[in-house]
């Protein structure tokens, strides 16, 4: 990316999202972060990451749920990203057994909302992060993209596999 781009990063307060946003901001790209800042991981850590990102003039942020299609669409239409990097997800294999609806809502409906708005605004690039959990019951310890992904072992893994299928379609 040699030209400066407008990039939406969902999950921008998470470990990977923050690191990516920081790197791209330092290169001069305009970054729009979108994150629910839920309490699955330490909220104070997420807020401190946002404080660092907010020091950049080329960073803007909205706290929101991906399931809130109206808020998401309004925010994205205002920013007009050329690239969307979708890293946000409700994470955690064990927690998905306790609150499966949250995983279905955030990971499937939220990702569908991202795909839909990306299509609507005709972004040049859409990157959607998945998880090694989609490989489920495979026996080998190092996975390949060509390995089977038809035996998920958790709701979390099933939602991530579902988002892959939705994106592919």
Task: Report residues per predicted region.
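N-terminal Rossmann-like NAD(P)+-binding domain of SDR-like oxidoreductases, especially those catalyzing
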Residues: 1-169
């Amino acid at each position: 990316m040699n030209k400066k781009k407008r990039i939406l990063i969902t999950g921008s307060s998470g470990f990977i999202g923050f690191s990516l946003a920081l790197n791209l901001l330092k290169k001069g790209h305009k970054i729009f972060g979108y994150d629910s800042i839920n309490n699955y991981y330490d909220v104070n850590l997420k807020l401190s990451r946002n404080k660092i990102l907010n020091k950049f003039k080329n960073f803007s942020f909205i706290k929101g749920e991906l399931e809130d299609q109206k808020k998401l669409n309004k925010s994205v239409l205002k920013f007009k990203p050329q690239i969307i990097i979708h890293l946000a997800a409700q994470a955690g294999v064990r927690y998905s057994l306790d609150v499966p609806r949250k995983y279905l809502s955030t990971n499937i409906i939220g990702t569908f909302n991202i795909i839909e708005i990306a299509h609507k605004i005709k972004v040049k690039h859409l990157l959607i992060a998945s998880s090694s959990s989609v490989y489920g019951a495979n026996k080998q310890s190092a996975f390949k993209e060509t390995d089977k992904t038809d035996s998920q072992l958790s709701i979390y893994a099933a939602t991530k596999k579902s988002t892959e299928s939705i994106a592919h379609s």
